[in-house]
């Protein structure tokens, strides 16, 4: 009986000291491309036990690695492993992205402010969803600054962008 207990204790000690899985970052080269004449890149940020990857295409979070209670790392963001899947996937185009310039739907792709009626491209069964065909999720954002643990992105949509009135400048940190 004493030998069985010793064997069990030894197994527990060995398995509890087993190497925890590590963060597996996506290669930046899988996100290097040009969209609408603008360079797209993948940025890796680290702070403490966290690691996050962000692309300036749509200002989207691509991965977020965090340890569980046992110290094993998991990516908790639903997304793709390469830029082509984000650019060419209209069915799931909003994964990890900033939506806008508005979220949700504009019924019939039209609304009125005062006497002015605005019409937008419809991209969701006769409605305009999350900014329309060329919402913030489909634009290459400017990278204003990047450090080891922070990134600041911004985008400027001119007056009339996809039918929207007025210019819109949107920062994201």
Predicted segments — roles?
Residues 14-16:
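C-terminal motif of bacterial Sec signal peptides marking the signal peptidase cleavage site
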Residues 2-8:
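Sec-dependent signal peptide recognition
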Residues 3, 18-173:
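Surface-exposed acidic/polar loop and edge beta-strand patches at domain peripheries
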């Amino acid at each position: 009986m004493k030998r069985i207990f010793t064997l069990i204790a030894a197994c527990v000690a060995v398995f509890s000291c087993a190497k925890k899985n590590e963060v597996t970052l996506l290669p930046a080269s899988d996100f290097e491309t040009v969209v609408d004449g603008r360079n797209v890149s993948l940025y890796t940020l680290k702070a403490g036990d966290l690691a996050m990857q962000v692309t300036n295409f749509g200002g989207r979070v691509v991965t977020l690695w965090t340890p569980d209670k046992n110290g094993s790392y998991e990516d908790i963001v639903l997304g793709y492993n390469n830029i082509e899947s984000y650019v060419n996937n209209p069915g799931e185009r909003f994964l990890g992205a900033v939506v806008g310039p508005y979220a949700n739907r504009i019924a019939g792709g039209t609304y009125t402010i005062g006497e002015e009626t605005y019409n937008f491209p419809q991209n969701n069964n006769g409605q305009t969803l999350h900014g329309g065909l060329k919402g913030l999720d489909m634009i290459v954002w400017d990278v204003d600054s990047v450090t080891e643990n922070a990134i600041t992105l911004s985008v400027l949509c001119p007056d009339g962008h996809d039918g929207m009135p007025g210019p819109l400048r949107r920062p994201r940190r």
